[in-house]
């Protein structure tokens, strides 16, 4: 079975770090992620995904992330239930992050030009592939099995 999630989005507010009773750091934040289609009104619907990080990753996120920051999160979906003080049961679905990547430089963050920053990131990514010939199919035949490393 496989439980793997990869998300790219922006934080909806500053992350919150707490400690468990065993003093293990845990940081939570919500990621706004656009869906892959445009609605009839011409907008992309957005999902708000709760993210949980633990230990060292929790400390890194708490110290470096702020509202609006563009990040990539890799992790797994977790569901859990809990009862409040009134006895009401609550169900939560969240992503437990294994990795959080910062997708924009800290120095340029918060300038108010988020869409422009995303465009620049896309252009930088596209430049990685400029030197690849159009007819390259991703496969290079090996002339002799003597060249194989095994």
Swiss-Prot record:
<feature type="region of interest" description="Disordered">
    <location>
        <begin position="105"/>
        <end position="124"/>
    </location>
</feature>
<comment type="subunit">
    <text>Homotetramer.</text>
</comment>
<feature type="domain" description="SSB">
    <location>
        <begin position="1"/>
        <end position="104"/>
    </location>
</feature>
<dbReference type="Pfam" id="PF00436">
    <property type="entry name" value="SSB"/>
</dbReference>
<keyword id="KW-0238">DNA-binding</keyword>
<dbReference type="GO" id="GO:0006310">
    <property type="term" value="P:DNA recombination"/>
</dbReference>
<feature type="compositionally biased region" description="Acidic residues">
    <location>
        <begin position="115"/>
        <end position="124"/>
    </location>
</feature>
<keyword id="KW-0235">DNA replication</keyword>
<dbReference type="InterPro" id="IPR012340">
    <property type="entry name" value="NA-bd_OB-fold"/>
</dbReference>
<feature type="short sequence motif" description="Important for interaction with partner proteins">
    <location>
        <begin position="145"/>
        <end position="150"/>
    </location>
</feature>
<comment type="function">
    <text>Plays an important role in DNA replication, recombination and repair. Binds to ssDNA and to an array of partner proteins to recruit them to their sites of action during DNA metabolism.</text>
</comment>
<dbReference type="GO" id="GO:0009295">
    <property type="term" value="C:nucleoid"/>
</dbReference>
<dbReference type="GO" id="GO:0003697">
    <property type="term" value="F:single-stranded DNA binding"/>
</dbReference>
<protein>
    <recommendedName>
        <fullName>Single-stranded DNA-binding protein</fullName>
    </recommendedName>
</protein>
<dbReference type="GO" id="GO:0006260">
    <property type="term" value="P:DNA replication"/>
</dbReference>
<keyword id="KW-0227">DNA damage</keyword>
<keyword id="KW-0234">DNA repair</keyword>
<dbReference type="InterPro" id="IPR011344">
    <property type="entry name" value="ssDNA-bd"/>
</dbReference>
<dbReference type="InterPro" id="IPR000424">
    <property type="entry name" value="Primosome_PriB/ssb"/>
</dbReference>
<keyword id="KW-0233">DNA recombination</keyword>
<dbReference type="GO" id="GO:0006281">
    <property type="term" value="P:DNA repair"/>
</dbReference>
